């Protein structure tokens, strides 16, 4: 383990960025492209859209709800063994899914087992990355998360090609092989010890203090609302386009168009997050609002050109909000608590990930089309952007990380934990 007084803002941190790049591709790139499998599962098991939607929703929810476990294990054991174990579980889940004979099997294999593997990989990696960077944190986060955009661009048509040539069982076998590369990504994570770590207490003390922290709780509410609508296009856009008369392959390529725009948005947002003065939460509110508007406009579009424009707009803004969403957390809780803070955020926002796609599928079953599904998804994002305005210093011209007054001690049951006042812990 490397010991430092403060984040190095580079060095081995760039290898952690590389690891996070491939991990984000192999976790959320797969999840975002799973809409290609959606139509196949509906036909294979002769089930309603709402029931099939639970496969991806359970996977997202387990990944997020199990994040505190991955965070606590990483605090004790370091991120490397935890992430490598998660890679094995993710691959095993996809392998078992290829033998499924019912939706229940897919709920357990992809949703529960692969979701558990994703919980042990994604959050510890991003937390490790946040500890390596301070001044360039948003840029590093943006570069790392471009893996989602690149893989979404590549995986959607790739998965459709695999389905056409090997059917869904053979395609899942190959996705399992891809997921096994998460083990190699975990090997790149070198633990970093910071001076701040000695003052934050153990995992339970950190969790207790965060649950008493008003701004942190409001932020988790905002992300939960955002998460409810965020993934809807990646689950139901292909099906929506097929309802409009599109062939499966062109519909999958529209996801790729959104993925290219997503990639550009992540890099641009990461650069802006470090370059623009003021709290990063303001940028997050802007991108969230624009994402919600573009989602709500999808049912209005009928022409191919209009749908492509909306896909580009949605891809850019949804990609742009992701790196700044993760960059706000260390500003609120400090780098010493980033493992537990990020884990708690992922757990609480899992409620949105669990309910979003099934709600969208239910609205489609009731109304006969996806109009209400996309409008409601956009409304959830707009509601989340409204909550972001309540964060401390939102209207200030100075970022939370630029001022560092004296420490403040917050009392939790049976423990006293010194916390930096600049991180908003004195505000409720």
Swiss-Prot record:
Subcellular location, record wording: Golgi apparatus membrane; Cell membrane
Broad class of where this protein is predominantly found: Golgi
Gene3D superfamilies registered for this protein in UniProt: MFS general substrate transporter like domains (1.20.1250.20)
Descriptive protein name: Monocarboxylate transporter 13
Family statement: Belongs to the major facilitator superfamily. Monocarboxylate porter (TC 2.A.1.13) family.
Cellular component terms (Gene Ontology): Golgi apparatus; Golgi membrane; plasma membrane
Its job: Proton-linked monocarboxylate transporter. May catalyze the transport of monocarboxylates across the plasma membrane.
GO molecular function, one term: monocarboxylic acid transmembrane transporter activity
Keywords: Cell membrane, Golgi apparatus, Membrane, Symport, Transmembrane, Transmembrane helix, Transport
Cytoplasmic domain ranges by topology: 1-10, 395-428
Keyword Cell membrane included in the entry's annotation: yes
Organism: Rattus norvegicus
Topological relation to the membrane, as annotated: Multi-pass membrane protein
PROSITE patterns: MFS
């Amino acid at each position: 383990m490397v010991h430092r007084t403060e984040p190095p803002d580079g060095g081995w941190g760039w290898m952690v960025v590389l690891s996070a790049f491939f991990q984000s591709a192999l976790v959320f790139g797969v999840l975002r492209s799973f809409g290609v499998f959606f139509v196949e599962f509906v036909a294979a098991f002769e089930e309603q859209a709402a029931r099939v939607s639970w496969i991806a929703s359970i996977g997202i929810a387990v990944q997020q709800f199990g994040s505190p476990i991955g965070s606590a294990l990483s605090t004790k054991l370091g991120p490397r063994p935890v992430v490598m174990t998660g890679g094995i579980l993710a691959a095993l889940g996809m392998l078992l899914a290829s033998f499924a004979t019912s939706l229940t099997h897919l709920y357990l294999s992809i949703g529960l087992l692969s979701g558990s593997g994703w919980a042990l990989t994604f959050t510890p990696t991003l937390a490790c990355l946040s500890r390596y960077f301070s001044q360039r944190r948003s840029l590093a986060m943006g570069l790392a998360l471009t893996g989602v955009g690149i893989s979404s661009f590549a995986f959607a048509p790739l998965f459709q090609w695999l389905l056409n040539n090997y059917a869904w069982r053979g395609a899942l076998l190959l996705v399992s092989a891809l997921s096994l590369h998460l083990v190699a990504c975990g090997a790149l994570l070198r633990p970093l010890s910071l001076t701040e770590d000695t003052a934050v207490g153990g995992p339970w003390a950190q969790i207790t203090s965060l649950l008493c922290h008003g701004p942190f709780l409001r932020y988790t509410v905002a992300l939960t609302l955002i998460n409810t609508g965020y993934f809807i296009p990646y689950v139901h856009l292909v099906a929506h386009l097929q309802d409009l008369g599109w062939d499966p392959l062109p519909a999958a390529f529209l996801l790729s168009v959104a993925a290219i725009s997503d990639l550009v948005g992540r890099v641009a947002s990461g650069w802006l997050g470090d370059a623009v003065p003021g709290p990063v939460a303001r940028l997050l509110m802007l991108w969230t609002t624009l994402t919600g508007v573009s989602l709500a406009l999808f049912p209005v579009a009928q022409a191919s050109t209009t749908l492509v424009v909306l896909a580009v707009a949605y891809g850019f803004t949804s990609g742009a909000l992701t790196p700044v969403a993760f960059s706000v957390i260390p500003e609120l809780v400090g780098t010493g608590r980033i493992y537990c803070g990020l884990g708690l955020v992922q757990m609480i926002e899992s409620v949105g990930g669990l309910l979003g796609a099934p709600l969208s599928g239910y609205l489609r079953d009731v109304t006969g089309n996806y109009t209400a599904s996309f409008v409601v998804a956009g409304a959830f994002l707009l509601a989340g952007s409204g909550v972001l305005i309540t964060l401390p210093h939102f209207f200030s011209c100075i970022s939370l990380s630029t001022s560092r007054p004296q420490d403040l001690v917050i009392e939790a049951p049976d423990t006293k934990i010194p916390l930096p006042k600049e991180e908003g812990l004195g505000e409720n």
